[in-house]
Amino acid sequence: MASNKNRKVSRKKSRKKLWLAIGVIAIVVIVIGAYQVLGQSANQTPSPSATPTSSPSSSTDNEYTNSTKVLLQTSMGNITIELRNDMPITAGNFKSLVQKGTYNGTIFHRVIANFMIQGGDPTGTGYGDPSIPTIKDEFTSDNHNVRGTIAMANTGQPNSGSSQFFINVVDNSNRYASFDTSYPVFGKVVSGMDVVDNIASVATDANDRPLQNVTIISATILP
């Protein structure tokens, strides 16, 4: 009898140990799973919104009071840009190139969905036209590369901006730490953001060049 009782007690203890072990394993699995999920979220780099719904509208802020507007007639539709009046070097350079007809017949040579569309290079290569002088970097205290703004492109070196520009398709201010201190915003799209979005969605090759040219037929100063 004693032997039977001992076996029963032993089996009960074994079952308790088994359930205890299962419980511990379950807790460990849950904790590890939670840690992995939180870790992935914490390590994810913030990315621009892929579905922005609005673009900067014409405002009465000082930087756009009585400002110049430029019409880009492209092969995919018209885009109207309003230039900041507190960016005399950058906006002035863009306006001067428009008046000279520099942008007429150029293409958007670099297009990246959910990022930007880039154009303004008379050579169409992205290397730029060496005959066009570079300008000094110019930044305002509220330089933000948000959706719909137009900014000066450069080679990555100081004071290397020339004729190339890009239009932000999404909010790129947080794309990386120095984005807003690298690319000066000198205007914004006030009409035709749908055209910008359509250009941003065209098929491109491995170098982000559209498979079919998207051309700036003409760029003109609006009265």
Regions inferred by a protein language model and the residue ranges of each:
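Cyclophilin-like peptidyl-prolyl cis-trans isomerases
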Residues: A2-P223
